[in-house]
Amino acid sequence: MANPIEEILGTAAAIAKGMGITFKEMMGPTVTDDYPDAPPKFEERFRGVHVLQRDVNGMEKCVACFLCAAACPSNCIYIEAAENTDKIRMSGGERYAKVYNIDYNRCIFCGYCVEACPTDAITHGHGFEAASYNTSTLVKRKEDMLVPVPPGAKPPSMADEVPAGAH
């Protein structure tokens, strides 16, 4: 049987050693970020919410080829294509995405859509605050994801489009 005084001294030494480590860590620099007071720093390869890109002329890069939707393993991308006309050109191709939705209830941020896009129209941005109490707000529309028109570029306007049946 061990000496009770040795046991008490051993326990006190272990507690003192643990408290020393604790106080040393308390006085050192913090490892965690001060979010939301300070913006987080992301690596270049961070996969945040999706962004639909425009070219230098302000036209949408998406040509509605559906390759991103086909590559998506969770089927969270929905696209409706429309033809570009002489009066209105929304993209550089024959078609443009009239409707482009991503359902973040299903998206797993795998990046397959970004890899599949031949025109680099869809990319991962650095946005990460997508949490919501309402799941219907997690379906992002094209208008929510498009980058602003570059300065000096004239954006295409849907107001010039001929109404259906008026041909």
From Swiss-Prot:
Cofactor: [4Fe-4S] cluster
Catalytic activity, reaction form: a quinone + NADH + 5 H(+)(in) = a quinol + NAD(+) + 4 H(+)(out)
One GO process term, biological-process aspect: aerobic respiration
Residues binding [4Fe-4S] cluster 1, per UniProt: 62, 65, 68, 117
Cofactor comment: Binds 2 [4Fe-4S] clusters per subunit.
InterPro entries the UniProt entry points to: 4Fe4S_Fe-S-bd (IPR017896), 4Fe4S_Fe_S_CS (IPR017900), NADH_quinone_OxRdtase_chainI (IPR010226)
Chain intervals for the UniProt region annotation (Disordered): 148-167
The protein's Enzyme Commission number: 7.1.1.-
Intracellular or extracellular location(s): Cell inner membrane
Keyword Phosphoprotein: no
Pfam families for this protein: Fer4_7 (PF12838)
GO molecular function: 4 iron, 4 sulfur cluster binding; iron ion binding; NADH:ubiquinone reductase (non-electrogenic) activity; quinone binding
Superkingdom, taxonomy of origin: Bacteria
Signal peptide: none
Domain 4Fe-4S ferredoxin-type: 52-82, 98-127
PANTHER family: NADH DEHYDROGENASE [UBIQUINONE] IRON-SULFUR PROTEIN 8, MITOCHONDRIAL, NADH DEHYDROGENASE UBIQUINONE IRON-SULFUR PROTEIN 8, MITOCHONDRIAL
Matching HAMAP family: NDH1_NuoI
Record text on subunit structure and interactions: NDH-1 is composed of 14 different subunits. Subunits NuoA, H, J, K, L, M, N constitute the membrane sector of the complex.
Chain's role: NDH-1 shuttles electrons from NADH, via FMN and iron-sulfur (Fe-S) centers, to quinones in the respiratory chain. The immediate electron acceptor for the enzyme in this species is believed to be ubiquinone. Couples the redox reaction to proton translocation (for every two electrons transferred, four hydrogen ions are translocated across the cytoplasmic membrane), and thus conserves the redox energy in a proton gradient.
NCBIfam families: NuoI, PRK05888.1-3
The protein's name: NADH-quinone oxidoreductase subunit I 1
Species per Swiss-Prot/TrEMBL record: Solibacter usitatus (strain Ellin6076)
